[in-house]
Amino acid sequence: RRGSSCVSSVAERMHVKQFAKTYLDHGWKIVPLAPKSKRVTKAGWIGLEFTVEDFRDGDNIGLRSVDGLVFVDLDSPECVAFANDFLPTTPSVYGRPSKPRSKRIFKSTIPKTIAYKDSDKTTLIEIRSNHQDMAPPSIHPSGEGLAWEADLGHPAEVDAAILTRCVKLCATAAVIARHYAPPGGRHDWTLALAGTLRRRGVSEDEAILLVQTAGHWSRDDKLPDRMREVSSTYAHSEDDDEPYTGATRLKELSTGGMAETLTKLWGAAPASTSAYVLNSRGIPDARSVANITLALERLG
């Protein structure tokens, strides 16, 4: 069943021991959880191996993200909505009625959990590794039942760098959507946003998808203008006399620490001397007003 598969009554749920056997047969490691809880019932569980007989009626069950199994946890509603645009496809997907398809399993070599957060410290999306995640047929603390979107399948195998970048792009789209500029101020804001992304190694196609996805979420009725603004930024040469705007300008135009969050996500813009005015020794002239302006623009 698809679509409505997350909506199931307790009577429809397979016995937890049946699920435990299925997971073990699939080569996945399991852990008993307290009923209607994410809490592991056994102390020292990280060093233990569990079997079907370790589960009691009513227990929840966790799947361990070990042996190359990696979970992507979509925490925010934006990331739940945007995941199909940014994440690789995998057949191993589950969720609950209020957060369908919010857990996606991959095979990769990411050694530890990475959480991507907004400026208010709320988690947007996580790559979870060497941990455990509550899995079907568990009952979430909210009372909702977890269910697979379809058959378990075999998780898609994805290179660690590719999966990490895809998750980072999804988090970036969520940040942009959460702090999308109000009507009347979107032109300069988009130019500065595009410059911020470009200087941090985001490609033009990625930047267009980011702004397009966040713009749809924010009901921007002038998305074609936004796309042109992004493309115009990427059309600039780094040697242009008038450099395109970036994080410094974005800080002035955005709210909620958006520019700072993007800088934390992607890192500071790499230094480059190609557009600076050089002195007689062939190094950037520290007294040049143009150089000072460009340096400030590239700081963010």
How would you describe each model-predicted region?
Residues 212-227:
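Short, mixed-charge aromatic SLiMs
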Residues 169-195:
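C-terminal accessory/binding modules appended to enzymatic or scaffolding proteins
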Residues 1-174, 221:
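Conserved phosphate/metal-binding and DNA-contacting active-site motifs used
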Residues 2-10, 193-194, 200, 204-210, ...:
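N-terminal nucleic-acid engagement/recognition segments and initiation subdomains in replication
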Residues 22, 26, 137, 189-200, ...:
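Short, hydrophobic/amphipathic alpha-helical patches that form generic packing surfaces
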Residues 55-58, 65, 202-214:
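Short amphipathic alpha-helical interface segments
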Residues 18, 57, 180-189, 201-206:
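Structural motif
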